[in-house]
């Protein structure tokens, strides 16, 4: 299935709004300080959403880091050659002393970043540490976490 960048961005934007507007204290896998420290959990929920819409997709989760001892981490999704990041704006909120100069100089970061990976700033800031492959049913993920994703997803969509 070949999705357009516009279709992906529209869904990512809608999903980000659902997270922003939800009851963060009572929604599974969404934390109070969203978007700060929320990149992996939010990306997992977004991958669940994408796979509910488009079950034939293969999504890549990208774990990356920068800074001294790779202490600043980030996580985003890729669909084919398209980067999808719905928590990059956390780096606008984190104190300068906790970040690298490269991150500080890149501000302000958008809340939703969807672009072709060869045009994405993420690869200039972060080093990829590992990637994960997500397909419908999440065969590589523990059942209890899949259940939590389903619960959080339903809370977001049907609140």
Residue ranges: model-predicted function:
Residues 1-159:
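A structural boundary/capping signal
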């Amino acid at each position: 299935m070949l999705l357009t960048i516009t279709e992906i961005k529209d869904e990512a934007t809608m999903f980000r709004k659902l997270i922003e507007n939800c009851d963060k204290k009572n929604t599974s896998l969404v934390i109070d300080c969203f978007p700060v420290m929320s990149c992996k959990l939010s990306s997992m929920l977004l991958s669940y959403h994408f796979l509910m819409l488009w079950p034939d997709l293969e999504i890549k989760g990208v774990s990356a880091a920068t800074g001294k001892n790779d202490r600043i981490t980030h996580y985003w999704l890729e669909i084919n050659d398209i980067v999808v990041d719905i928590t990059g704006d956390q780096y606008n909120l984190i104190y300068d002393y906790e970040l690298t100069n490269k991150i500080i100089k890149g501000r302000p970061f958008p809340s939703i970043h969807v672009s072709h990976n060869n045009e994405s700033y993420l690869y200039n800031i972060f080093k990829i540490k590992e990637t994960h492959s997500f397909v419908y049913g999440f065969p590589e993920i523990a059942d209890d976490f899949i259940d939590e994703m389903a619960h959080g997803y339903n809370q977001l969509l049907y609140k």
